[in-house]
Amino acid sequence: MPVLAGINSKVLKNGDSEPSPPPAGIYRIYNMRFCPWAQRALIYASVKNVPSEVINIHLKEKPDWYFSKHYKGQVPALELDEGKKHVIESAHIPEYLDDLFPESRILPSDPYEKVQQKLLLERLAAVAPAFYAAAQAANNPEGRDEKYAALVKAFEDAEKLLTGDFFSGKAKPGFADYLIFPNYQRVFWLSHILPNSPFSSESFPGPNFPKLAKWYRTLDSIPEVAAASQPTEMGVGFFNDYLKGTPNYDYGL
Amino acid sequence: MPVLAGINSKVLKNGDSEPSPPPAGIYRIYNMRFCPWAQRALIYASVKNVPSEVINIHLKEKPDWYFSKHYKGQVPALELDEGKKHVIESAHIPEYLDDLFPESRILPSDPYEKVQQKLLLERLAAVAPAFYAAAQAANNPEGRDEKYAALVKAFEDAEKLLTGDFFSGKAKPGFADYLIFPNYQRVFWLSHILPNSPFSSESFPGPNFPKLAKWYRTLDSIPEVAAASQPTEMGVGFFNDYLKGTPNYDYGL
């Protein structure tokens, strides 16, 4: 059974015809190769070994038919049951996959531990808006210091929240680890580009964040996570264009 | 066993001492009587008959100790296990209560039906920011038409999404119904105050929304929902002050 088949296929865009529904038993993920939210679904499918295929979508020239998969036209969307069912939103798709495939469950079964993982993820997700603000500052020095400071603050908060090796609180990564990793990976890519980056691209995020640095290295080296990630040079290249306002969703293909 | 004991107690504020932990088996909800998000937890506890007590918090003069219950100091927060456990966030507390008390489960057990209820709630929640924008327009005519139009649009979208009697898709109300009701109740209160309100306070929301009107009447008349709600005159009175910038969290007590 394939897992994440077609992850590096070119995007479908307005004018392209709608692909036929996924075959029975195959879970299709609508994706954009550099989208951190869609990557959450990819990582989960990869770690859980879900039979899956990926279709990439042009986010500036969306096909009309895509709005029948996601009413807002965003990624990710999960399509199953030969096209008859859809699940959207980056935090809901993983939980749904856990409910559907409990034998490879990543979220805890205990209600209290489960809800704490979801709440921790939401708390850690403060890194995302801080990242986008800092990214905008790359080409615009105005307010750059404040934006960098806000991003550093998000990292400091995460460093404090990381009390063991993983945000799961266990000996192996869990829901919060896998789902927040893509956001950190975006900052890692950005650290190659940002003028006076507050983070080290060599020993990311740098010596002030020893726990996060070890965590990032560990997550990054998990084969199932790597299989759901773009290589660093692709990510850096994409963001170079993105910051100029000309993202190339097929960068490197 | 009491349910929602103390729902009309006066707020605790900065300087007030921390209450002793809830007794074993009692679920404490930190609340503000007019907060639609906290009311989600109250309705769920009421419908599920969870042994519970309510402590109201002054949202402009928060007690320092409250930040140990909710790191942002917001309501709702659920406190249990004699003060040793906390669950926050208005959509997570209800799901947690369903996991904890599965015999009175409101969310569907089927994974697909469950995630669709959660996604539908998020879609319906577009009414909330539109409500706050329209409320600000009460005392400021600038941009009022656009703000009213956005709120009407949220109602039109909901009217379309309500394909049966309830957002649950079943013969009785479910997760999405109970959790979105407080937001509609706020618009109902506001319709008594708004100059040129686009909604009728007599047959709320009005003749253009026949399905929502029936839905609202039905939800409003459920005793367990009423027990978790403030009476109309209280809500209207609170919002009158709120719109002047001087909310009285103990209004009517």
UniProtKB/Swiss-Prot annotation, chains A, B:
Purpose of the protein: Exhibits glutathione-dependent thiol transferase activity. Has dehydroascorbate reductase activity and may contribute to the recycling of ascorbic acid. Participates in the biotransformation of inorganic arsenic and reduces monomethylarsonic acid (MMA).
Biological processes, Gene Ontology terms: glutathione metabolic process
Domain GST N-terminal: 25-105
Keyword terms, alphabetized: Oxidoreductase, Transferase
Pfam families documented for this protein: GST_N_3 (PF13417)
Annotated source species: Caenorhabditis briggsae
GO cellular component: cytoplasm
EC number(s) per entry: 2.5.1.18, 1.8.5.1, 1.20.4.2
Domain annotation GST C-terminal: ranges: 110-238
Residues annotated as binding glutathione: K62, V75, E89, S90
InterPro entries reported in the protein's UniProt record: Glutathione-S-Trfase_C-like, Glutathione-S-Trfase_C_sf, Glutathione_S-Trfase, Glutathione_S-Trfase_N, GST_omega, GST_Omega/HSP26, Thioredoxin-like_sf
GO molecular function: glutathione dehydrogenase (ascorbate) activity; glutathione transferase activity; methylarsonate reductase activity
Family indicated by similarity: Belongs to the GST superfamily. Omega family.
Active site per the UniProt annotation: C35
Catalyses which reaction(s): RX + glutathione = an S-substituted glutathione + a halide anion + H(+); L-dehydroascorbate + 2 glutathione = glutathione disulfide + L-ascorbate; methylarsonate + 2 glutathione + H(+) = methylarsonous acid + glutathione disulfide + H2O
Protein name per UniProt: Probable glutathione transferase omega-2
